[in-house]
From Swiss-Prot:
N-acetylalanine carried by residues: 2
Effect of residue 296 to R: Loss of HIF1A Asn hydroxylation activity and slight stimulation of 2-oxoglutarate turnover
Protein species of origin: Homo sapiens (Human)
Name by which UniProt lists this protein: Hypoxia-inducible factor 1-alpha inhibitor
Binding site for substrate: 152, 181-183, 201-203, 238-239, 300, 321
Keywords of this entry: Acetylation, Cytoplasm, Dioxygenase, Iron, Metal-binding, Nucleus, Oxidoreductase, Transcription, Transcription regulation
Cofactor(s) the record lists: Fe(2+)
GO molecular function terms listed in the Swiss-Prot or TrEMBL record: [protein]-asparagine 3-dioxygenase activity; ankyrin repeat binding; carboxylic acid binding; ferrous iron binding; NF-kappaB binding; Notch binding; oxygen sensor activity; peptidyl-aspartic acid 3-dioxygenase activity
Length: 349
């Protein structure tokens, strides 16, 4: 990744940039949180640039500046969505901090002492807007983050916008890569300063920014040992245990070696987040509401002939499968860690 990223530094991957018709830069460094680790810029390229195709083919991140993937949605704001999105239910998370750590409610029974750091509530879109405006008016620490898969409850205008997405381009990407089906389009509406802590997904993702600006810091799968994910059976599976704001280097010493790949995406930008790449996402400080739509695809089928040496993401998949199988064989997820320690301690190091 380093070589290809270096080629694209000239395109301004990590610098505040001026938008067409804007007076000055769209954002500045004061809107970014400070962290202890170094980062390199993610390339910003035209979708017609051969280097962009090469990066996607190699499963490396790239920001595509001109796909027009979600062009009809660039007019979306809270008012437009409230008028047109329909009367369906939306999942809205609330937290007393800026961090929204994902958790799987189905796995909470495995860890009885687990307490989620955010609460999920189902509400109508107008209720979300009213609650958001109330929080903004009275101040305080409470934050909201709407995260909802787009479905058939949306209104006609949203359907028309959705049909106007550049499906021709994205379907070609899917076909060229041999990916599986589109599994979902996740709508994300966040308050300024909201953070989704570092995690990885087991799907390919085109992350399309619609409103506002988001900073995205990615880490390749080979930095797994630096990011210390929760156990597979934990509700926060696939999430890093490291607090980026205040890293505990005694518990997580390898985090000192982590190196990120960074960009800020704005309206119309599409970030390719490869499967198994860690990503930390933050809505810029003092940047207003952000709106994003994810395009999640299943990965390509496992090739019949495995090539060695295995790639880092394949090793992550193997580790996940080992944890899952041990949990099933032992009948108790709590026994997985002690058994792995018994197997490895003093034998392989």
């Amino acid at each position: 990744m380093a070589a290809t990223a270096a080629e694209a530094v000239a395109s301004g991957s990590g610098e505040p940039r001026e938008e067409a018709g804007a007076l000055g830069p769209a954002w500045d460094e004061s809107q970014l949180r400070s962290y202890s680790f170094p980062t390199r810029p993610i390339p910003r390229l035209s979708q017609s640039d051969p280097r962009a195709e090469e990066l996607i083919e190699n499963e490396e991140p790239v920001v595509l500046t001109d796909t027009n993937l979600v062009y009809p949605a660039l007019k979306w704001d809270l008012e437009y969505l409230q008028e047109n999105i329909g009367n369906g239910d939306f999942s809205v998370y609330s937290a007393s901090t800026h961090k929204f750590l994902y958790y799987d409610e189905k796995k909470m029974a495995n860890f009885q002492n687990f307490k989620p750091r955010s609460n999920r509530e189902e509400m109508k879109f107008h209720e979300f807007v009213e609650k958001l405006q109330d929080i903004q008016q009275r101040g305080g620490e409470e934050r909201l983050y709407l995260q909802q898969t787009l479905n058939d409850t949306v209104g006609r205008k949203i359907v028309m916008d959705f049909l106007g997405f550049n499906w021709n381009w994205i379907n070609k990407q899917q076909g060229k890569r041999g990916w599986g089906q589109l599994t979902s389009n996740l709508l994300l509406i966040g308050m300024e300063g909201n953070v989704t802590p570092a995690h990885y997904d087991e799907q390919q993702n085109f992350f399309a920014q619609i409103k506002g600006y988001k900073r995205c810091i990615l880490f390749p799968p080979d930095q797994f040992e630096c990011l210390y994910p929760y156990p597979v059976h934990h509700p926060c599976d696939r999430q890093s245990q490291v607090d980026f704001d205040n890293p505990d280097y005694e518990r997580f010493p390898n985090f000192q070696n982590v190196v990120g790949y960074e960009t800020v995406v704005g309206p119309g930008d599409v970030l390719y987040i490869p499967m198994y790449w860690w990503h930390h996402i933050e809505s810029l400080l003092n940047g207003g509401i952000t709106i994003t739509v994810n395009f999640w695809y299943k990965g390509a089928p496992t090739p019949k002939r495995i090539e060695y040496p295995l790639k880092a993401h394949q090793k992550v998949a193997i580790m996940r499968n080992i944890e899952k199988m041990l949990g099933e064989a032992l009948g108790n997820p709590q026994e997985v860690g002690p058994l792995l320690n018994t197997m490895i301690k003093g034998r392989y190091n």
